[in-house]
Swiss-Prot record:
The chain crosses the membrane at residues 40-60, 68-88, 103-125, 149-169. The keyword Transmembrane helix applies. This is Secretory carrier-associated membrane protein 5. The lineage of its organism: Eukaryota, Metazoa, Chordata, Craniata, Vertebrata. Interacts (via C-terminal part) with SYT1 and SYT2; interaction with synaptotagmins making a link with the SNARE molecules. Interacts with SLC9A7. Residues 61-67, 126-148 are extracellular. Keywords: Cell membrane, Cytoplasmic vesicle, Endosome, Exocytosis, Golgi apparatus, Membrane, Protein transport, Synapse, Transmembrane, Transmembrane helix, Transport. One of its GO terms (biological process) is positive regulation of cytokine production. The gene is SCAMP5.
Amino acid sequence: MSEKVNNFPPLPKFIPLKPCFYQDFEADIPPQHLSMTKRLYYLWMLNSVTLAVNLVGCLAWLIGGGGATNFGLAFLWLILFTPCSYVCWFRPIYKAFKTDSSFSFMAFFFTFMAQLVISIIQAVGIPGWGVCGWIATISFFGTNIGSAVVMLIPTVLFTVMAVFSFIALSMVHKFYRGSGGSFSKAQEEWTTGAWKNPHVQQAAQNAAMGAAQGAMNQPQTQYSATPNYTYSNEM
């Protein structure tokens, strides 16, 4: 088997840095979890785009007469939260679906609940916090309508992000509880060290893949094309 080479993030060749992670949905994730994993990845991408749009909104805020603090914080949130959200909550759920690890699920729940709270705060938009939320945007309409309209775009995106985050958290929690997962299982993985044992992880991944393939290849009940009836000659 060829060695897996890190391929994410896909950096341009002129940047003297190399990718930090290996990511291949089709190769790593069992088919029954593929759709959910990709949706969470798209949610991470939406979060990153929202932070970038928020930077533009805060620039319009600054040009319209707002303080420079919001623009500076918006830039900080972009360069800080984009990689941190990938490492802190997407990689754990990627690993959880890949290896069926209860510890990784718990790590995801813990960090993603923080992500949900942050998204709600961003949507609210407290002035001076570097986010174009509802309070900051609505209050700025009386100062500069043009800037406020631009600020409205990241405000809507923050709101969408908060709603989608709540839905995603509910769906993953429902799946985890339905599959028999629990906090005690995560504690057991932590105690035994199974969460960081590559052999255990590979065995769990192979078992998940095998279960998925078995479900898809399950033989169907065969029926005879021509029915065979036996009649009695006795009257």
